[in-house]
Design a protein with these regions (language model features):
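Histidine-centered nuclease catalytic patch
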Residues: 19-20, 40-76, 85-107
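Internal, well-ordered alpha/beta segment that forms a basic, Gly-enriched binding/recognition surface
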Residues: 95-129
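Charged, low-complexity surface segments at secondary-structure and domain boundaries
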Residues: 2-16, 120-123, 140-154, 173-175
């Protein structure tokens, strides 16, 4: 799950914060800031991008609602992630959230027993509390779901597998390019990042190219892939993923 920074409330030509009367009116602004991806599963979407309230506007009785129209409470989601999340009360102490944590760190994408599908699991090496939080986030968004119904709706696991194949292909192209006497490092790294922009599922790309600093620089370049939280990657150390909340001793992720 890609860590995000969508920035402050957009402004109009006069520099005034934009105010909307319907939350869906944030859609184009969100696309301009973070791209056309579901913020949770990271699949790219050509249509049906849903504007989703991070903190539900209609939570269960007794739970404070999230702001119905505020920019700070808006993100983009696919139907399966948004429907799974529903009106569940949300806070950053219970779940890993892309604007609050380095959400690349607590999850891994792996093949299911059925190799046509890839699912999200808790990353190896988490402590007990982090593992539970990662598990709860996966459960909240059904990121380990495989839709086996004849009238399949949720194809996230199929798209993850397709992204895995894209990453493998990109790695082969990269290795051949590096071996070429005409190798241009900047051109090749930029090409890899543009492939990632088309593919989505960014954690797969970070994992594959983690030891290629120039590729990591391009993968986290907001001019190529909008909205990545650059403070979650260390430019002094080859753009390695780092904790977003280092002051939180219990869980710096």
């Amino acid at each position: 799950m890609r860590p995000l920074n969508k920035g402050n409330t957009p402004t109009d030509a006069g520099g005034n914060a934009i105010v909307v009367t319907a939350y869906r009116d944030w859609r184009n602004h969100l696309i301009n800031r973070i791209g056309y991806y579901c913020v949770y599963c990271n699949q790219p979407l050509s249509h049906s991008l849903q504007v989703e309230h991070v903190i539900p506007k209609n939570p269960p009785a007794g739970v404070a609602p999230g702001a119905a129209l505020d920019w700070d409470n808006m993100l983009l989601a696919c139907g399966p992630c948004n429907n799974a999340k529903g009106n569940t009360p949300i806070d950053a102490n219970t779940y890993y959230l892309p604007e609050e944590h380095n959400t690349h760190l607590p999850f891994s994408i792996v093949l299911n027993a059925n190799p046509d599908h890839a699912i999200v699991i808790e990353r190896v090496g988490l402590n007990v509390n982090q593992h539970q939080k990662a598990h709860d986030t996966i459960d909240l968004l059904e990121l380990d779901n495989i839709d086996a119904r004849p009238a399949i709706v949720d194809i996230r696991s199929l798209k993850r597998k397709a992204a895995m194949l894209s990453v493998q292909s990109a790695r082969q192209v990269y290795d051949m390019a590096v071996a070429s006497p005409t190798y241009n490092a900047n051109v090749v790294a930029t090409d890899i990042a543009r492939r990632a922009a088309d593919s989505g599922f960014f954690s797969l790309w970070y994992e594959e190219f983690i030891n290629e600093p120039l590729v990591m620089e391009k993968l986290t370049d907001n001019a190529i892939i909008k909205g990545t939280a650059t403070n979650c990657f260390d430019p002094a150390n080859g753009y390695q993923p780092i904790h977003r909340n280092p002051a939180n001793i219990a869980d710096p992720i």
